[in-house]
């Protein structure tokens, strides 16, 4: 049904060749009416444009509905996008509630470049563990300075409002993924009105955004809305992306907010729709074992095959093995210390005792590890879970205790289990079952400050090249200092050129600086590009280093 809806929407496209009025580029015509953006010096912005009806009231916990309202006055597109309602890990203190339930918008940023009449497009799906974040969490000044690409940022439902699921057709889940999908359709339909090229759309994302991008690619009809895709430090096989146990969490959520009498999905859904959104989102605190662990209590699920408009009804591994996914060029990446998220959190000192969380891990490993590393719901028995916890500790720590001194070994464990291993598995499956080019790179060049320092709230630890150190050279983020080093400046420009050339390539070629990525499809070995401060190098490997 979802595919049929896509074809219907694609058949109704209203596409123009450029912004409506060349004499006034801030004024744009859409099927809904006229809108006016802002002049930002070297680019124009058109922000907070609704692509779906507000997901409130009866539309809460439903697939998004295309925005159909007509504007009688000129729409004010100068207001920055609001974040979707969330329990935000990066808000200090006990009250982490932020955002608004009415949030399904896209924001368009168009270069001032008189040398060209149209621009290729990069659509960005933000990260945040499917729980927090928003279109405004990353800056775009670096991105827009080159003047060659239109950027579109997508907002989508998060946390329980975006991903609660009972595992059946009545409360199927994946509403946030369906939001992203509708936003991509909106971009395909409307971007020409801003001077964008609907035939040249690249979709990228970082962390949960990267996992989202991969999940979008795993739908065969993704090729109708985009030409290529890149998943930075996140893919559909990461253990925190597609999870089990959603039904239990859905009914536990109901119990917390006063829907404990519900014994079936229909009753639960009706009751949850009647509750204030703030109560539903604030209930996230009850699913955290300590601090912000697990970092994704609500995320994507495999939906029931009979669910209306199901986004995915098979596990990603099975989808890839079937070959029934979009055959578009796709790249997947990781950093050498990606596991700094969320491992660095364990170095924070507890307000109550002054001890780091990592010290308490010695006594709580068997309790906490399944939540930290996302295998709590995938194990059949407690014994299986304990055996796996014991195996991991022995492999990475041996007989040593968890401490600040042994932190790097713990971070390596997090990197392998949460990011690197699943990146390698994804790459291996795609090279065996895909047809379009599949690429990969690893980034090793630590930022002076990054997400590690932000989580640990300390600057005396060297975290290495952590989660976001590459992506934040494309889109600024407050966790790192804004001033780039000279080597980072070069890498940033190479990344931007990489995106530009990738979306324009007719044969899916991908290059960074002087290095051309090697395609993994049909290769007997893994092809991995290594990017460091000294340049780039193609590696041919049996397994990731």
Swiss-Prot record:
Glycan-carrying positions: 113, 421, 507
Signal peptide, first to last residue: 1-19
Entry's EC annotation: 3.1.1.1
Keyword annotations of the record: Disulfide bond, Glycoprotein, Hydrolase, Secreted, Serine esterase, Signal
Subcellular location per the Swiss-Prot or TrEMBL entry: Secreted
Family statement: Belongs to the type-B carboxylesterase/lipase family.
Protein name per its UniProtKB record: Esterase-5B
């Amino acid at each position: 049904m979802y595919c049929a809806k896509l074809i219907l929407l694609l058949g109704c496209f209203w596409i123009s060749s450029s912004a409506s009025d060349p004499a006034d580029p801030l004024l744009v015509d859409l099927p809904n009416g006229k809108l006016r953006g802002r002049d930002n010096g070297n680019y124009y912005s058109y922000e907070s444009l609704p692509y779906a009806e507000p997901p409130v009231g009866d539309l809460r916990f439903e697939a998004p509905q295309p925005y159909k309202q007509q504007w009688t006055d000129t729409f004010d597109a100068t207001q920055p996008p609001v974040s979707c309602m969330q329990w935000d890990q990066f808000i200090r203190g006990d009250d982490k509630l932020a955002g608004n339930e009415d949030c399904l918008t896209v924001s368009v940023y168009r270069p001032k470049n008189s040398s060209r009449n149209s621009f290729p497009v990069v659509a960005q799906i933000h990260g945040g563990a499917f729980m927090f974040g928003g279109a405004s969490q990353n800056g775009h000044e670096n991105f827009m300075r080159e003047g060659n690409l239109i950027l579109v940022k997508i907002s989508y439902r998060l946390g329980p409002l975006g991903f609660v699921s009972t595992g059946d057709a009545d409360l199927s889940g994946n509403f946030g993924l369906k939001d992203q999908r509708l936003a991509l359709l909106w971009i395909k339909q409307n971007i020409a009105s801003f001077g964008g090229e609907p035939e040249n759309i690249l979709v990228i994302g970082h962390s949960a955004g990267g996992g989202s991008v991969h999940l979008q690619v795993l739908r065969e009809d993704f090729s109708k809305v985009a030409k290529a895709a890149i998943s930075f430090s996140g893919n559909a096989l990461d253990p925190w992306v597609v999870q089990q146990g959603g039904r239990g969490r859905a009914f536990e959520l109901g119990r917390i907010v006063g829907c404990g009498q519900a014994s079936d999905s229909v009753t639960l859904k009706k009751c949850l729709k009647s509750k204030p959104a703030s109560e539903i989102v604030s209930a996230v605190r009850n699913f955290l074992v300590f601090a912000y662990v697990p970092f994704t209590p609500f995320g994507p699920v495999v939906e029931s095959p009979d669910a209306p408009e199901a986004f995915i009804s098979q596990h990603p591994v099975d989808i890839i093995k079937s070959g029934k996914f979009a055959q578009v060029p796709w790249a997947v990446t990781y950093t050498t210390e990606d596991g700094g998220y969320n491992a660095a959190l364990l170095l924070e000192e507890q307000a109550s005792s002054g001890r780091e969380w990592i010290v308490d891990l010695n006594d709580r490993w068997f309790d906490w590890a399944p939540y930290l590393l996302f295998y709590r719901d995938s194990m059949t028995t407690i014994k299986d879970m304990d055996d796996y916890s014991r195996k991991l500790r022995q492999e990475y720590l041996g007989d040593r205790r968890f401490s600040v001194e042994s932190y790097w070994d713990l971070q390596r464990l997090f990197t392998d289990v949460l990011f690197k291993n699943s990146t390698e598995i994804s790459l291996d499956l795609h090279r065996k079952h895909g047809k379009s080019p599949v690429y990969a790179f690893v980034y090793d060049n630590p930022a002076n400050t990054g997400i590690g320092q932000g989580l640990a709230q300390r600057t005396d630890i060297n975290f290495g090249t952590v989660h976001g150190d590459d992506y934040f050279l494309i889109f600024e983020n407050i966790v790192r200092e804004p001033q780039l080093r000279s080597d980072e400046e070069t890498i940033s420009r190479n990344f931007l050129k990489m995106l530009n050339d990738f979306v324009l390539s007719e044969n899916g070629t991908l290059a960074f600086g002087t290095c051309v990525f090697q395609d993994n499809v049909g290769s007997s070995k893994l092809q991995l590009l290594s990017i460091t401060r000294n340049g780039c190098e193609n590696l041919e490997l049996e397994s990731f280093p």
